[in-house]
Each structure stands twice: as structure tokens, then as C-alpha cells.
Amino acid sequence: MSTGTSASYKRDNAFYALDKVERILLDGYSLCDACTGRLFGLRGYGLSNTERGRALKTLLIMKAFQASPRQADLELLRVLARTGFEPARELLKKLSGEDVEVKACSICEGLTGRYYELALRAVEEAKSYEFNTFEVGVRIDAEVIRREEELWRRYGLESAESIRNEASREVGKIISKLTGKEYSRNNSELLIIVDLSAGAIELHPAPVFVYGRYRKYARGLPQNPWPQPDERIKFNTSIEELIVKPALELFEAEKAKFHAAGREDIDVRTLGTGRPFVLEIKKPRKRNIDLKVLAEKINSGAGGLIEVLDLAYTDRKTIKKLKSLASIAKKAYVARVKFEKPVDDEKLAEISKVFSNAVINQRTPTRVLHRRVDKLRKKIVYRLEARKISQDEVEFYLETQGGFYVKEFIHGDNGRTTPSIAEFLGNNVLSIELDVVSIEETAA
């Protein structure tokens, strides 16, 4: 038999684990039942590491005792007794009268005996949270990991399981049994961090994601809290605040993040189907709120400034979808524009044809140039219709690609957007009242 085949045979032999444990204990290590079994934790199923460790120690007692008391291997019994293994302690005392002192486990120093205690504490602390699924994360002193891995290397142990992995599983099993909740590593609603060394528990509830659409009825209302004075702002609040505050109260959450499919200017209304958004509610204690109640609370508290609709639970993927579509999905607008002089009727009659599926060149608008890089964007106007209201006023209906600067398309931004409505009509723009009336959630 070759050397490689012989080594493989020894590793696969039923007595391989037994021989390794005997050698380790006789070399002066003391291992608790769990740490003993964990040395071969990746071998087989159906046994806990504690059960596996006790089984190995039981077999070693049988080996130590042999055929009769006179032939007993007292040294092997002593090292087994020092691990705290009661059958070995009792047998040693009976055979030799010795009562050896129990040594702390050379790897965990007693930490594996804390699983049930920490699980109970986690269950108690989790009572104030709503959840159906959970997972357990483990923190442990680096010295424990070092001792464990050093033992693996020294004795060539290739099927050992880490104490961190064992603790996560065993504490999770206890919590699941005590609460009836499901242990899940995927999409868990509550992450329970167990610090084995410090004996501490941390709870981290997963965010709740709520999809919806908002209509903005008031001009002068920013989407998010505005950091500096702005003459366009007419209200001491924002769309985000009007939506977030009621949600925090109902979900008993610490904070929330507001994700919208783009944004309208402060002086622009959003009507029609509304603007899609996702509310990411962080560290919620409640997860199963009736969203009709949330919508009513938001709408009644908004005083007519905004309205939310179509609220539904969703997940993080929807945020990515909203962000990715914001620059390409089709949007529709109605703009009421006042010009410097009377509008040419013939030109106005041609405008729909000229700007049907037209590609517009837009440099970064002057009004945002201080905070955005100056670059050229090519965007599409799919449809443009015009209705004359008075000699110098026109109402336009536009359907455009997402990320399109509508105001600049109307007034031209001193040539930074071309072609523009003002350029085509040969007429300067004095004022614009703009409304968003439709935002699609699929690319045009």
C-alpha cells in the first residue's frame, strides 16, 4: 500500500477520530464534550457535537478499562476525568481512589456551556420585536479562534467545525424551539448577534420596505429637507418628512430612508398617477402594519400638500429598479408657459411634428452647474402637443425620456439645450408652471 493510500486509509478508518482524541488528551489538552465532537464536526449527521464528543470519550473509557480493572489505563482515565467527563471521574475514583481536578477546556474555556443561557436572554430581548424568521450571528474572542485553529493545524484535523458556526446553529436551534420562529439564513427578519465571550446580545431587525406613489399638490414643497434658504420654498416641511414621520410612529422604528423615482423641482407639482417611491424603514419593532392605516395617517397629516396611494410591501430590489429606470422611463408633463410676445400660430401648428421623437442635446443646466458635472446628455421628446390659451400663453403636453430637463427644453437655457421650444418659436420665455402627470415604471 502506498504512503498516500495509507494516510487516506487512516483518515477514513473508524478509529481515526478516536486515536486523534486520545493523542490530544494525552498531550495535555483538556476538551469539553462540544469541543471534542467539533474536531470531527463535518463527519456525519444527526449528532450534535456534544453528543459526538461524549461518544468518543465513552469509547476511550472502554479502551482504557480493557478486560479487567488490573489492566486499566489509568493515565487515559485521568486525562478523560480532567475534562469533566463524569463517567471517567467515577471510574477512576472507583479503581484508584483518585479525585482529579477538572481543567477548563483548552479551546473554549467553558463558552460552549453558555448556549442555553444566551438563547434565553435573546428570546427575552426579542419579545418587543415582531418577526417570523431570524438568524444568529456570533462574536467570539480572537484568542479562542486562534487556540482552535492551532489545534487543527498541529494534529492535521481536516473535518473540524468552527466554534462560531456551532454556536450560531445551536443557539439558533434553542431560540427556534422556544419561540416557534424559523431559523433562516436568507431574508431573515431579525439578526440576533450573540457575543459568546462578553455574554452580550444585540438585535438587528431587517428593514421593512414599503412601495407607494405620491401626488404633490402644492408648489413650493421640496421632496427632501432643504439644507439652505430658498425663496421658492413656501412650507416648513418636505414630502419625505410628511411620509416618514407617520411611518416611524406606526412601525416603532428608529429612522427611515426615502427613495424616489427621480425628483421634481420645488415649484413643480406631481399629479396624475403620482411618483413611485420606496420607504426603507430601519430597525422597526413592528413589521405587519396595515398599510391602509399608514396611508390614512400620512394623508390626514399632510394637510392637502401631498397624497400617497397604492402602498404595498416590497423588497430592496424595487429600490434598484426605481433608480435604474429614473433616467430612461417615460414621463409626461403639462407646462403652462408665458412668452415675451404673442406666439406665432403657424409655428405653433408645426411644433408637434417637429418635436415628435426628437433628440434633444442638453448640457448640464446652469441652475445646477454648481453641484453637477458639466456634460452633454442626449434625451428624447416622444410627443409634444400645444394648446394656445392667450396671445402670449401656451399649454404644452410633453412625453419625454427620464432624466430630461423640461424647463430648459422650454426656455433653452441660453443655448445649453438645443433645439428648444423658445428657439423654435423665436420667442423668449417669461414664466413656466410645470406639472408631472405620469411616470412609467418600465422603460419606454
Swiss-Prot record:
Entry superkingdom: Archaea
Active site: 265 (nucleophile)
GO biological process per UniProt: tRNA pseudouridine synthesis
Lineage of the organism: Archaea, Thermoproteota, Thermoprotei, Thermofilales, Thermofilaceae
Residues annotated to bind substrate: 333, 405
tRNA processing keyword on record: yes
Catalysis performed (reactions): uridine(54) in tRNA = pseudouridine(54) in tRNA; uridine(55) in tRNA = pseudouridine(55) in tRNA
PANTHER family the UniProt entry points to: TRNA PSEUDOURIDINE SYNTHASE PUS10
Enzyme class: isomerase
Name of the protein described by the UniProt record: tRNA pseudouridine synthase Pus10
Family: Belongs to the pseudouridine synthase Pus10 family.
EC number: 5.4.99.25
Underlying gene: pus10
Pfam families per UniProt: Pus10_C, Pus10_THUMP_arc
GO molecular function: tRNA binding; tRNA pseudouridine(55) synthase activity
Gene source species: Thermofilum pendens (strain DSM 2475 / Hrk 5)
Function statement: Responsible for synthesis of pseudouridine from uracil-54 and uracil-55 in the psi GC loop of transfer RNAs.
Keyword annotations of the record: Isomerase, RNA-binding, tRNA processing
